């Protein structure tokens, strides 16, 4: 399963435009190839959570724009959904918004001898993400974060 960052970067501002019109936050945009087929996945959210109508309205509007702008040369399937309970964290604002929640962060390079941190998000300080991973606070620059998401233990 490979991702195509170039297409994602072209689609992101189009998705944010639609999100702004519908009062929805664009959480993530993924363009992937799975089992020989391409999928454009757009994850949306709002404070009270999204429902099927939100996803349908967003899908209809973004579909028209994607047809007009045509940023994707090959055929693909469009999927619009909620990010789920283990939503990805992409922007500094995400880490601030979900301070106090449990999260998992993977970094590109080792920080304090490790590349994976799981613990309580403490927010943002001096432009860096702060997490308490059980051994005290760790500050992680956003550009060093390879992947981050909320975690939920059942």
From Swiss-Prot:
Single GO cellular component term: cytosol
UniProt keyword Amino-acid biosynthesis present: no
Any single GO BP term: translation
Gene3D superfamilies: Ribosome maturation factor RimP, C-terminal domain (2.30.30.180), RimP-like superfamily, N-terminal (3.30.300.70)
Subcellular location: Cytoplasm
Pfam family, one: DUF150_C
InterPro entries on file: Ribosome_maturation_RimP, RimP_C, RimP_C_sf, RimP_N, RimP_N_sf
Keyword terms, alphabetized: Cytoplasm, Ribosome biogenesis
Its biological purpose: Required for maturation of 30S ribosomal subunits.
Family: Belongs to the RimP family.
Entry protein name: Ribosome maturation factor RimP
Source species of the chain: Carboxydothermus hydrogenoformans (strain ATCC BAA-161 / DSM 6008 / Z-2901)
